[in-house]
Structure formats: C-alpha cells, structure tokens
Amino acid sequence: MVNPVLVFDQVSLRYNGAPLLENINFTISPGEHICLLGKSGVGKTSLLNCITNTKTISKGTIYFNGIASNNKDYKQLKKQFSFLDQVPNLIDTDFVYDAIWREAKNNLKWWQRLFLVEPQSLREQIIQILEEVNLKEYVTYIIKDLSGGQKQRVEVAKLFFANSQVLLVDEPTTGLDLINAHKIMELIIQFARQKAMTLIFVTHDVEFALKYSDRIIALKNKALVLDQATNKLTKQKLMQIYHD
C-alpha cells in the first residue's frame, strides 16, 4: 500500500474567532491530481495556505509524508511545495529568459551555483522549456510587455526547475479567455505528469474540475461536502454545491 503524501485529520482554521475551515478530513496519495472546488470564499485558498503552513491551523493535524504539522520539522518542508498563484509573481523589468534563468539558478545545488556560471546545457534547457510553453519567440521580450496568459506561461515554465513534490495551484486561469485558460491548465497537467508530482488545484469552474482532475474535493460553508473520483461525478451533481 502506498503511503499518503498528505493527510488532513479533523483540521479547522479560524481567524479572529470566525471559522474559515471546519473539521476537514481527507487523504491524498502521491501523483494524484486533485481539484478543490467551490464558490469564492468557502476556504479553498485558506486550505492551500494550511498545507504550506502559511496559516496555522486552529485544530486537528496535517501530515505531509508522515510528518505532523505541529512538528518543528514541518516548517522545513516548504521547499517540497511549488505554488502557482492566480496573479503572476514576476518582475516587470525582467526579460523572459532572465525570469526563467533566475528560477533555474535558485534551484541548483549550492556547489552547482558555486562552480556554474551559465552552462550551455542549462541555456539549451531553458530554450526548450520556453518552446514547450509556446514562448520561444518571446525570449527577449520584457515581462511587462506580455499578456496575462503569456505571463502565466512564464510562471509555468519556471515550475520545470522546481524540485518539489507537490504543486499547489490557486485559480491559475483568472482573467484569461477560455482558449488561453485551457492552454494554461493543459501545460500544468503536462508539467505535473512529467515531474510525477502531486497536483492540487483550486477552481470554481465545474467543467475545469471535471476535465483536469482525478478526484474532486468540494467545499461549501467552510466544510468538506464531497470527496469522490472525478469519473464517478457529473456536472449536474457538482452544480448542486453552488445552491443553498
């Protein structure tokens, strides 16, 4: 039996006395593609922040690879999580190539950073990745001159150099037209498969949930109301969580 990568055991989160999450329980296995589904404000982003320990839970325990969230070693596990936000976190004055190079350099081991200036092999790898995300012709463009969809592609390209085990994605298609939204999600799925990563992505879009996940965990009124394999679900059933 495969050991779970992530376990939520009776997890609750409060802020200034107000509940953000209530008694959340689930288990995620390595390599699963999980969708967190629900309306805005139900606690989806808060749940991601609990995983990374950005928010401290009020009750219960989170386990990552068997290490409990109240264990001091849990805070040292942040490098095991890559995070893709709905707003690209890029420097406007960077060239596209430099944004990728900086991420690649940051993920090199210390001895590689010490002795590596900018090896041809890494340069070629960056160009190859930019080609995979359809940005090769934008390599010398400045970030501020890119569209929203192109900026998200740069963020996805940066992920190829991450050494993490879990990819957390928070509404990555916000503000994008439908065609570009699907392209971004397809790139994210492609990346997660290539790196054999566990993927947890947040969306309020039922069709995206059905298309891109193995399993859907739905939140409503701060509580978990559904946890089921995607191939057992229908659009009609999922739409019920949006009705009071």
Swiss-Prot record:
Concerning its family, UniProt says:
Belongs to the ABC transporter superfamily.
Query: Keyword Nucleotide-binding, does the record have it?
Result: yes
Task: Say which domain of life the source belongs to.
Answer: Bacteria
Tell me the organism: Mycoplasma pneumoniae (strain ATCC 29342 / M129 / Subtype 1)
**Which intervals hold domain ABC transporter?**
6-241
Give me the disulphide-bonded residues.
Answer: none
Q: Which InterPro entries match?
A: AAA+_ATPase (IPR003593), ABC_transporter-like_ATP-bd (IPR003439), ABC_transporter-like_CS (IPR017871), Metal_Ion_Import_ABC (IPR050153), P-loop_NTPase (IPR027417)
The protein's role, per its UniProt record: Part of a high-affinity transport system.
Q: Which Gene3D superfamilies match?
A: P-loop containing nucleotide triphosphate hydrolases
Q: Which GO terms describe its molecular function?
A: ATP binding; ATP hydrolysis activity
Q: What is this protein called?
A: Probable ABC transporter ATP-binding protein p29
Against Pfam families, the record matches this protein to: ABC_tran
Where is the organism placed in the taxonomic lineage, from the top? Bacteria, Bacillati, Mycoplasmatota, Mycoplasmoidales, Mycoplasmoidaceae
Residue positions binding ATP: 38-45
